[in-house]
Amino acid sequence: MTTLEAFAKARSEGRAALIPYLTAGFPSREGFLQAVEEVLPYADLLEIGLPYSDPLGDGPVIQRASELALRKGMSVQGALELVREVRALTEKPLFLMTYLNPVLAWGPERFFGLFKQAGATGVILPDLPPDEDPGLVRLAQEIGLETVFLLAPTSTDARIATVVRHATGFVYAVSVTGVTGMRERLPEEVKDLVRRIKARTALPVAVGFGVSGKATAAQAAVADGVVVGSALVRALEEGRSLAPLLQEIRQGLQRLEANPGLKESSKKPLS
């Protein structure tokens, strides 16, 4: 299943796509795979976070998960193996969220090539402004990975135009200025951010940061998709089942009226 097909399927069902985030190797290798099996029936796409020692864009919940996964021996090689195992479980799009440092440490061509071979659909690069290293972005795309970048409510229209020009797959709209984490309510600015992004690209737009339940999911459902991370990781941290939370969030993603249809994107890797 392609990324556009996954978003289109959700839209045909009158809802935003659900994109669960899980940290590779948390709460353990086996626990991670169990969590994947629990979220897959609800997920349209899946985001897997590569644990990193200095996750500047992540809040305390995901920071703790990364620290524990690293202490238990999770590594880039371990994440590769997990992506391969997850790919054997599903045909749904799988996106690897990674900071730039591990990519550079392994060498971009090797890193991207191995994750593509393992079954990743694309990479989310939260700390890479794509116009600062278009060659690296182009390399990922030529290897066959979709490239996803973040935009915030503070992003200017000019900045949005620059970022979406380098993006493939979908565009990640950050609901708040700050780090990941659960919130009781999302700021109203998220609607305007989604509108401004969609005015400049045919790619799907997914909202992340702060979605923790039905109410915040409903707010975020102005977008084509919604990423849920900290709330799921917190549930794993506390030893709770993920199904009740996923059911609640799916209810919030249901729309009374479907958003305007996704246009078939003709975007190709940068040349």
UniProtKB/Swiss-Prot annotation:
Active site: 47, 58
Highest taxon above the source species: Bacteria
Entry GO terms, CC: cytosol
Pfam families registered for this protein in UniProt: Trp_syntA
Keyword Protein biosynthesis in annotation: no
GO function term, MF aspect, one: tryptophan synthase activity
Pathway: Amino-acid biosynthesis; L-tryptophan biosynthesis; L-tryptophan from chorismate: step 5/5
EC number(s) reported in the record: 4.2.1.20
Keyword terms: Amino-acid biosynthesis, Aromatic amino acid biosynthesis, Lyase, Tryptophan biosynthesis
InterPro entries: Aldolase_TIM, RibuloseP-bd_barrel, Trp_synthase_alpha_AS, Trp_synthase_suA
Catalysis performed (reactions): (1S,2R)-1-C-(indol-3-yl)glycerol 3-phosphate + L-serine = D-glyceraldehyde 3-phosphate + L-tryptophan + H2O
Family: Belongs to the TrpA family.
Assembly: Tetramer of two alpha and two beta chains.
Role, per record: The alpha subunit is responsible for the aldol cleavage of indoleglycerol phosphate to indole and glyceraldehyde 3-phosphate.
Name the UniProt record assigns to this protein: Tryptophan synthase alpha chain
Native source species: Thermus thermophilus (strain ATCC BAA-163 / DSM 7039 / HB27)
Source species taxonomy: Bacteria, Thermotogati, Deinococcota, Deinococci, Thermales
Gene name tied to this protein: trpA
